[in-house]
């Protein structure tokens, strides 16, 4: 066991972790859930908080890495899902709920004329890239350093999220023949994109981009950068894919497309849309989407695609994401992130804080964080002191400098104020 000391009673979590390692790799089912000396095990959650098996209560800004926008154990979602459970969980046949949710997505998201449901963000990005390659008959794709588009071979190169946190941004087991078609570019760098396209004329199928890089912290696009990507892809007949698995339905009703006023050809969504259940989707222009089988020849399929449980939860979630939701969650994130920056400044701690609507993160870094190379030079040891300090004070964030924090509709002013008190205590302790 690691010698990191957390000043909380975590005896039951410790025992469960010891047992879990006998059956689960490092005791977890996703790398981002592990932290030293061991993660706490959750017993229950409600609204804005988690409760672990030892009875410790945490204000939650991880929110299951984004999906829990309406708070944990939302009664409307739970009741709707319970009712659907009485009628079946999977049919292998279409349901009306697939149409209902698709129509809601199309109503909200500017690029969405048609939808294909899948089961995760990973499936969505993999299928979107396959679609772009099939349509253009080109193999090469451009992705950005530090961007995480899921755990599939096309894009698991210089990835952010858990891959970067645990020191493996390039995963073994992926053939060079696969990744040789993946061209890396620094985010927010126009010249690099111009040069790559010039050197690979008529060979690039698509550019895939997180409009806000939420898997290497929270890095917003520079002014007009997304507009630049839209223009240069149109000029060169390259398909532009927005990976909106994080930003979709979170930062605006229509995601980053609406927020920044830039419409891609295709987009991928997930997380929030499932209301806590597994889900993903590829959305885009009809002329592109109709190339998926069975209408076209580009194959995409899944036993649980459009399953009625996820459709039910998705419908209930999106109907509650109104103007009040966006103004409230953005306001609470701004209040908290402003305080984080002011408090770090007061204690002479080098930092940069970035906020986009209800997404935010602090980097312990003196330099403006505009891309992966700068982000990975942040003081990760200091970040973990910040993480452990918050945990000891009843606040949970993702245990990585390279993840994002989120607010939900349940993070009221009182909750934010309590969090601010905890942050003040943590920064005092860090600088002692």
From Swiss-Prot:
Keyword Isomerase appears in the UniProt entry: yes
Cofactor requirements of the protein: pyridoxal 5'-phosphate
Any GO BP: protoporphyrinogen IX biosynthetic process
Catalytic activity reported: (S)-4-amino-5-oxopentanoate = 5-aminolevulinate
Domain of life: Archaea
GO MF annotations, alphabetized: glutamate-1-semialdehyde 2,1-aminomutase activity; pyridoxal phosphate binding; transaminase activity
Protein name stated in the entry: Glutamate-1-semialdehyde 2,1-aminomutase
Organism: Methanococcus aeolicus (strain ATCC BAA-1280 / DSM 17508 / OCM 812 / Nankai-3)
């Amino acid at each position: 066991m690691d010698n990191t000391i957390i000043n909380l009673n975590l005896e039951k979590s410790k025992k469960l972790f010891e047992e879990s390692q006998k059956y689960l790799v490092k005791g977890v089912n996703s790398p981002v859930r592990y932290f030293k000396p061991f993660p706490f095990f959750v017993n229950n959650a409600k609204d804005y908080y988690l409760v672990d098996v030892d009875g410790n209560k945490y204000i939650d800004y991880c929110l299951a890495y984004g999906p829990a926008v309406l708070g944990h154990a939302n009664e409307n979602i739970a009741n709707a899902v319970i009712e659907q459970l009485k009628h079946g969980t999977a049919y292998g046949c279409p349901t009306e709920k697939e149409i209902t949710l698709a129509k809601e997505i199309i109503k909200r998201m500017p690029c969405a004329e048609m939808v294909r449901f899948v089961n995760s963000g990973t499936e969505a990005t993999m299928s979107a890239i396959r679609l772009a390659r099939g349509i253009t008959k080109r193999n090469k794709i451009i992705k950005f350093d530090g961007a995480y588009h899921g755990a599939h071979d096309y894009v698991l190169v210089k990835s952010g999220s858990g891959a970067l946190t645990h020191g493996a941004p390039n995963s073994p087991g992926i053939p060079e023949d696969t990744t040789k078609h993946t061209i890396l570019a620094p985010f927010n760098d126009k010249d690099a994109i111009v040069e790559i396209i010039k050197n690979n004329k008529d060979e690039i199928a698509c550019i895939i981009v997180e409009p806000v890089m939420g898997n290497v912290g929270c890095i917003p696009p520079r002014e007009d950068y997304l507009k630049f990507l839209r223009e240069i892809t149109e000029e060169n007949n390259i398909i532009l894919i927005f990976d909106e698995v994080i930003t979709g339905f979170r930062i605006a009703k229509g995601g980053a497309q609406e927020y920044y006023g830039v419409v891609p050809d295709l987009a991928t969504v997930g997380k929030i849309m499932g209301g806590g259940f597994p889900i993903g989707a590829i959305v885009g222009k009809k002329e592109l989407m109709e190339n998926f089988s069975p209408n076209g020849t580009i194959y995409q399929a899944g036993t649980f695609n459009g399953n009625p449980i996820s459709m039910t939860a998705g419908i209930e979630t999106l109907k509650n994401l109104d103007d009040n939701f966006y103004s409230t969650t953005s306001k609470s994130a701004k209040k908290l992130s402003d305080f984080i920056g002011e408090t770090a400044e007061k204690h002479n701690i080098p930092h940069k804080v970035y906020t986009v609507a209800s997404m935010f993160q602090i980097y312990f870094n003196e330099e403006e964080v505009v891309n992966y190379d700068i982000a990975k030079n942040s003081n990760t040891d200091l970040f973990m002191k910040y993480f452990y300090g918050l945990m000891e004070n009843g606040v949970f964030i993702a245990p990585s400098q390279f993840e994002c924090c989120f607010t939900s509709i349940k993070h009221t002013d009182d909750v934010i104020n309590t969090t601010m008190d905890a942050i003040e205590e943590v920064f005092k302790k860090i600088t002692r």
